Amino acid sequence: HTHHPKHSFPTRRSSDLNNSIYTKWYPSLRNLDTVSIYEKYGIFSGQSLTMSNIPIAFASAMASAMIPSVAQLIAARDVKGAREKIGLAVKTTMVISIPCAVGLFVLAKPVISLLFTNKTAEELNLAAALLMTLSLSVIFYALSTLNSSILQGLGKVNTPIINAGISLVVQTVAAVLLLMFTRLDLYSIAIANTLYSGMMCVLNQWAVRRAVGYRQEIVKTFVIPAFASAFMGAAAWAIYEGLYIVTKSMRISVIPAIVIAAVVYFVMLILMRGITEQELRSFPKGYLLVKVAKKCRLLR
């Protein structure tokens, strides 16, 4: 996949800039102890950011799988086919990234404790709260990654880089202003990061729309996955809290909560007619999902 370095370049720049602003400029602004600043930034980048990148990486892998076919359709002058393909790619990305974002928001603390052991309560709370702040960026990054891949497939190689540059300016201004005028401290960086991803998402989406005159279907792409994810989030939280009362262990409680939540989401998505059998088949291991759904009488 030739396009990955191109996308990760601006994203890397985004973290480098955040790092410099928070660890170099901010301590001198507020006369703070640099050691604790570096420690806090380490928790942000090493745990919260790392965790939010997992679903984004998954979405990117699916995005890169779609690109050759979009490029072929455009080369064959089949704009209608390309639009359909793009629509399906965006929908697939949303169906996966919206529940991931909700799941990370609801189960931030137990998920961090599951992956990063031996943390003090204070570190755990900070990492979890930062992850909650970043959870929305999962959706934005997943969509902007997909759209920048599509733009490359359409031959607009520079557009995503220009958009990333614009977003970087927005992020930097936001980070500096928040650090100067609020007491949000490290949360300023998490908010600025989410703004960066949101800006990238909007600019890339516009560029794709301009390139192929394409309009995204809204209800099944965004609304139904969001509703199903809200149900799923409530279920995940209730199951986790219930198990935690009994087991007193975050790690033991979180795994069943994640598994049951995934099932709830899948069932809700199908019941609300958010996904068709054909779309389900285009998922990784889709034929298995269809088989299970038919066994459980969810699909006719």
Give residue spans per PLM region.
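Helix-loop junctions and terminal segments of transmembrane helices
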Residues: 56-77, 148
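Short, small-residue-biased leader/transition segments that mark boundaries at the very start
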Residues: 1-14
